[in-house]
Amino acid sequence: MRREKKSRAYRGSRTHGWGRVGQHRKSGSRGGRGLVGYHKHKWSWTVKYAPDWYGKHGFTRHPSLVVEYRTINVGQLDAEVEEFFRKGLASREGDAYVVDLTQLGFNKLTGSGQVRNKIIVKVPVATKRAISKIEAQGGRVEVAKTQEAGE
C-alpha cells in the first residue's frame, strides 16, 4: 500500500496552494516588474544586499589621458626578429637588426625573456630591464621614456 502520494503536483487544485486566483498572477506579489522599487518599498533589500546600488563610485579618467600599452617582451622580440627581417618589417645595420616597434603595432618593450641577437630597437616606452638586456648583447634602445618596474 502506497504511503505517499504518487505526485505532489496539486492535480485538480485550481490555484496550486497560492490562495485566491489573483494572488499568484502578474507582478503584484513581487512588488513590481523588473528592477522597480529599490528606492521605495524594497529599500530594506537594497540596504542589505546592494548597498552600492545608488550613488557615484570612483571616477573615470579622461580617455585622452589613458594610454593603452601594447607590449612585447625582449624574448618574443628576439625570437621573431629574423622573421620580421624576412618579411621586410626589420632591416640590418652591420651585424645588428633594426626594428621600429611602432610600425609593428607595439608601444612598449618589457624585459622578460632572453636576448641572443644584436638588436637596435625604436620604441616609445621601454623598461630599464629591457634596455639593459638589449645593451648586454651590443644593441641599443632608442626610447622616448624609460619606466621602472611596476609603473
Curated annotation (Swiss-Prot):
InterPro entries (alphabetical): Rbsml_uL15_N, Ribosomal_uL15, Ribosomal_uL15/eL18, Ribosomal_uL15/eL18_sf
MF (Gene Ontology): rRNA binding; structural constituent of ribosome
SUPFAM superfamilies for the chain: Ribosomal proteins L15p and L18e
Pfam family for this entry, one: Ribosomal_L27A
GO CC terms, sorted: cytosolic large ribosomal subunit
GO biological process: translation
Region (Disordered) residue spans: 1-33
Presence of the UniProt keyword Ribosomal protein in the record: yes
Keywords, ordered alphabetically: Ribonucleoprotein, Ribosomal protein, RNA-binding, rRNA-binding
Regions of compositional bias (Basic residues) in chain numbering: 1-14
Function comment: Binds to the 23S rRNA.
Subunit structure comment from the entry: Part of the 50S ribosomal subunit.
Family: Belongs to the universal ribosomal protein uL15 family.
Protein name in UniProt: Large ribosomal subunit protein uL15
Species of origin: Thermofilum pendens (strain DSM 2475 / Hrk 5)
